[in-house]
């Protein structure tokens, strides 16, 4: 099995042979997570912010979905099934019964893009393997499925002792799986907010000040993706062609 890593961020091809054989892929889940903890299962940290109705990342998730369709998917060396055909496929919406996020205890920070079922794709930590494999039964014309999500963390940004400043870091995560449910490709890009917020003992004392930093970090992330992703994927495809020519 070959692994190819490209430049800053992570663009990893976990199996070049499997990736090269993909003829058509379907995006089966796009979502965002407004839990700012490092642990995807920890919904206690920043709980006040997550329950604040003014902290709404729906339009960020909408923009991410559009970015995926318009700027990211066309850069891959194979076609994708139309979103409308995926989300309207018989049985697709029932995948939510196999989703980790059908449980309100872990789903209240999860914001799915319009019409998509949110599916977990954290590898050994937490992954909806049954739903991923089931998707191939519902979409028999594809030999790969993609899950894409955006999430955020608070990161240190200078300061002394317990009075460290914090920034928001935004992450784009894209993963492709084969019919056995094995991940064969992953991409992770990130970008920070420009501005900072003060904290005491590592805890932000005014959670509402975080909201504009989340929007700023996502704007920076989307701009970076548009600028750098085409080159990264082109380089990856070139390496695949070299591998296959040996």
Residue ranges and their predicted role:
Residues 41-147, 179-186:
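N-terminal segment of the mature soluble domain
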Residues 1-16:
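Sec-dependent N-terminal signal peptides
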Residues 16, 105, 207-210:
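Short, intrinsically disordered/low-complexity patches at protein termini
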Residues 21-39, 126-157, 161-246:
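C-terminal/domain-edge helix-coil "capping" segments
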Residues 20-21, 53:
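Active-site-adjacent structural segments surrounding the nucleophilic cysteine of cysteine proteases
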Residues 8, 45, 49, 53, ...:
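Generic alpha-helix detector with strongest preference for long hydrophobic helices that associate
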């Amino acid at each position: 099995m070959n692994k190819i890593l490209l430049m800053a961020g992570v663009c990893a091809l976990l199996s070049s042979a499997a990736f090269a054989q993909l003829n058509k892929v379907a995006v089966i889940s796009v979502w965002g997570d407004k839990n700012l903890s490092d642990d995807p299962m920890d919904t206690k940290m920043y709980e006040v912010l997550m329950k604040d109705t003014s902290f709404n990342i729906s339009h960020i998730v909408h923009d991410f979905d559009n970015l995926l369709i318009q700027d990211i998917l066309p850069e891959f060396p194979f076609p994708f099934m139309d979103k409308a055909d995926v989300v309207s496929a018989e049985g697709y919406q029932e995948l939510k019964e196999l989703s980790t996020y059908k449980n309100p205890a872990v789903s209240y920070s999860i914001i799915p893009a319009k019409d998509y079922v949110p599916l977990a794709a954290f590898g050994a930590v937490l992954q909806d393997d049954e739903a991923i494999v089931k998707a191939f039964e519902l979409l028999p014309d594809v030999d790969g499925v993609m899950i894409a999500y955006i999430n955020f963390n608070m990161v240190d940004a200078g300061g002394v002792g317990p009075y460290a400043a914090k920034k928001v870091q935004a992450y784009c995560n894209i993963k492709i799986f084969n019919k056995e449910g094995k991940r064969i490709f992953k991409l992770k890009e990130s970008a920070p907010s420009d501005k900072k917020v003060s904290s005491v003992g590592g805890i932000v004392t005014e959670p509402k000040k975080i909201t504009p930093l989340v929007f700023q970090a996502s704007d920076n992330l989307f701009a970076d993706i548009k600028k750098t992703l085409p080159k990264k994927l082109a380089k990856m495809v070139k390496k695949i062609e070299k591998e296959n020519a040996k």
